Amino acid sequence: MSTSTEQIRQKFTEALDDLVAQVKKDRSILAAILCGSLSHDAVCAKSDIDLALITVDDKKIESSHLSLCAGDANVHAFLMPRAAFRKTVEGSVRNSFAHSLLAKGRLLYTHDETIAQLCESLHGIGRRDTQVQLLAAATQALPPVYKAHKWFVARGDLDYTALWILHAANSLARIEVIGAGLLADREVLPQALKLNPPVFKTVYSDLLNTKKTRPTVQRALDAIDAYLAQRAPMLFRLVLDYLSEAAEARSCTEIEDWFKRHFDVDCVATACEYLSDQGLIARVSLPARLTKVSNVAVEELAFVYQGAPPDEF
């Protein structure tokens, strides 16, 4: 770490210490958790401080955000009653953004030992949480992958194809990091590049640092296609299990509603289209009506699992 960086960190730390000393005197604040770069990463002069403040449970106190001054530093504080914090910790999907932000944070002080215990529990990542986050990352990767193929094949625009590949690369990086059992934060691409250099050099750093040609862009698309295809049974485990247990066709509306309600995951119909293209499920149709008062039935896209139950992840 350079001298200037050390000086900046020292300046931020001193400003934070002064603010926390003030906050400790507030009887309505039970704990302070330092989040963001200052808690676990490098900072620069333009950095700010992210601070979670856990308050007492009181009907007059609601979760809120407040921008504070600490010396020359800007502090983004989010206040959360203890009950809401507990609900967030116990109910948050592990490796979601909220979970990662708090799990990588540092408890500065607490007047309530149960808050310390809740913070400690953040470091566990369950199997089900991993499956949900892998599914979410994979469904987010598919649309930009399709866009990249479209702009490459139909338009021949290498720059715009590369842009969509880079969009997809961020979701692929989440897959790589989560699959390795690590916490995925906003800086997943550098993490993934260390974990899997051959793939992420091709779909990320090479696209940024070398001249784009049809062969290099094609290699990036091929690398993405192979990456997803090799991992499809793992990434879409929850979808395969759902359709396998249903033992009959489910419409896209039913599928989307079920995954949104149970896991808060969108775009699962797109995932089903991909799985159908991969031969892992079958594309069928079910009768549907366009409105509640329609007198004509149309065919809605649906999917069915055909084959032995999926292997365990």
Name each region found by the language model.
Residues 9-13, 23-26, 94-95, 111-119, ...:
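Short, structured coil/loop segments at alpha-helix boundaries
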Residues 16-19, 23, 29-34, 49-54, ...:
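Generic hydrophobic secondary-structure signal
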Residues 34-45, 77-90, 103-116, 164, ...:
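Charged, low-complexity, helix/coiled-coil-prone segments
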Residues 2-8, 69-157:
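Conserved NTP/Mg2+-binding pocket subregion across the NTase superfamily
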Residues 2-30, 35-47, 52-104:
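Metal-dependent nucleotidyltransferase catalytic core
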Residues 1-5, 52, 86-99, 112-124, ...:
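Short charge-dense sequence patches
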Residues 129-287, 291-294, 301-313:
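Conserved nucleotidyltransferase catalytic core and NTase-mimicking acidic/glycine-rich helix/loop elements
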